[in-house]
Design a protein with these regions (language model features):
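Metal-associated gating/positioning segment near the N- to mid-region
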Residues: 1-65
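Histidine/acidic-residue-rich, glycine-tolerant segments that coordinate divalent metal ions
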Residues: 44-56, 61-113
Length: 113
């Protein structure tokens, strides 16, 4: 039987003064124990943080610590021309992001207005 793919994980995700308890090591180790062999985690930039800075931060958290294959989605938490320009860069082969999430909830935290 092939392994599963979890397309919606939040390892070490900061949120409202806390962060999710699983890091990339414990989360992917648990995933493997349950038969999941790949995860896709959300990169969530802080307000004002560039997409590329956030991507690099997530890669630093994950690389060398994951126990299975992984990829990344990108959340867009604020909007300006720099973000629009970075979206095309982040889709390049260098970064490999090919999906974005924009929030319609969490006003004053993630919601795009």
């Amino acid at each position: 039987m092939p392994g599963g793919i979890d397309t919606h994980t939040h390892f070490e995700m900061p949120f409202m003064g806390t962060k999710s308890i699983d890091d990339f090591y414990t989360g992917t180790k648990a995933a493997l124990a349950g038969g999941t062999t790949m995860v896709i985690d959300f990169v969530i930039p802080a307000k004002g943080e560039s997409l590329i800075e956030a991507y690099n931060k997530w890669r630093t958290k994950a690389d060398g610590r994951v126990c299975c294959d992984y990829s990344l989605h990108m959340a867009v938490t604020h909007w300006n021309e720099d973000v629009r320009h970075e979206m095309s860069k982040i889709c390049s082969d260098t970064f490999g992001i090919n999906s974005f999430k924009m929030f319609m909830a969490y006003k004053d935290i993630f919601m795009l207005t």
